[in-house]
Amino acid sequence: MSREINVNQMIDDSKLTPFHWRVIILSTLIIIFDGYDLVIYGVALPLLMKEWAIDPVTAGFIGSIALFGMMFGALIFGTIADKLEHLGVSRKKVIAVCIILFSLCTVLCGFSETTTQFSIFRFLAGVGIGGVMPNVIALVSEYAPKKFKSFFVTLMFSGYAIGGMTAAFLGSILVPLYGWKIMFMIAGIPLVLLLPLMKVLPESIDYLVRKKKDETVRFIMTKMVPSYQYQPDHVFVLNSSNQNQAQAPVKMIFQEQRAFSTMMFWCSIFMTLIMVYALGNWLPKLMIEAGYNLSKSLIFLFSLNVGGMIGSILGGYLADRYNVKFVTMGLLLLGAISLSLLSFQFSSVILYILIACAGAASIGAQIMLLAYMAKFYAPNVRSTGIGWGLGMGRVGAILGPILTGWLLSLQLPHFYNFLALSIPAVLGIVTVFLINDRRMYQPEPISPIANQNDTTTVKVNEAVSH
């Protein structure tokens, strides 16, 4: 008589092991590549505008091209990853395709000789960048113990800020010496690391169970739950909501009275992405306009991403102990205050602190929203929900650089530029508050192991001793 082993429940109840850290470190590395490729446009922008005689409005549109690609990437790759598993296209393969796409096209940007060529490659790179995010989030969420889910997702996405910090730091050293193209050449490193990375990154556990790859599942479960002892009568199963993931349509993210909250997630991401990409693309130029040189302006961008990393990790830690909604709202409030204060004149040290706070708020709140969605949606629609949230919210990312370029073209006093950027933070507080947590996914309270033909509950501590 067979005994069912619910792998999702065992992972939810597991304690942290080296295998968990392997998943989070490798996933964070992917997001570091992602963040670097996205931020380097802001690093190169001052020299690009000078070399190609680009006006602020045109520069804003070029900056939004990659974000437009990210919208398509998130919508396409976020959705098809939940549908293609029955064709043998695993989530890890989708991630690999996205890495190749954004790395190769970013390198090709460095060989561009016209704004048209540059824009085409930035768009294609954006498709890859946008596609990798929902799939890596879904992968990490599958392997994260329940009490660490928010922390794992936000820790992983602190890699975006690390990538931005790396781009800003290297840019402050290399760009004045070698020009802007060197930054795009460095983006080819993921292509070299791809094969070893894919070899050690585990496949989606849900995919492995559905495909009956029992030997691999058994190996992973013994790594994640060392006390688990496999028996020949054990049969690996998933939560009922995970079983038919490949057949999950987009409409499911609107069902069970989730439609309004789904729309509020979209609006919240829209607001945070306006801030993230307006600052990420234009902060060096804004600080140059305020009277700082190129190297120092790039250090301000470095400070923004340092704040983003701290805000992401701290926010994830707090979200697993308190309400993720109010942690996100608190970060947005910090953003509204710090961006408003940037409108005034302060010493460089105070400016660094305020910009770091703005990074914690904008980047941190954006990443908190991704962790929020990972908890809100059931596993069978998680990648779809996150992908569509990122895709629809990308409209804000697209508008952010364009609107900031338009603001600069008006040549308004420095005061108004940052004051305008604080408005999305205020609106974001409202939209996050309106998300209905009563519609959040609740996994069924079942034992990790039960008799397939007997519904009698087996105690959890017995699950690892049979």
Swiss-Prot record:
GO terms for cellular component: plasma membrane. Residues 44-60, 115-119, 172-181, 280-297, 347-348, 409-414 are periplasmic. GO terms for molecular function: carboxylic acid transmembrane transporter activity. Its main location: membrane. The chain crosses the membrane at residues 23-43, 61-81, 94-114, 120-140, 151-171, 182-202, 259-279, 298-318, 326-346, 349-369, 388-408, 415-435. It is found in: Cell inner membrane. Residues 1-22, 82-93, 141-150, 203-258, 319-325, 370-387, 436-466 are cytoplasmic. It holds the Pfam family MFS_1. InterPro entries: MFS, MFS_AAHS, MFS_dom, MFS_trans_sf, Sugar_transporter_CS. Keywords: Cell inner membrane, Cell membrane, Membrane, Transmembrane, Transmembrane helix, Transport. It comes from the Bacteria. It is a multi-pass membrane protein. NCBIfam families: 2A0115. Belongs to the major facilitator superfamily. Aromatic acid:H(+) symporter (AAHS) (TC 2.A.1.15) family. Probable uptake of benzoate. This is Benzoate transport protein. It comes from Acinetobacter baylyi (strain ATCC 33305 / BD413 / ADP1).
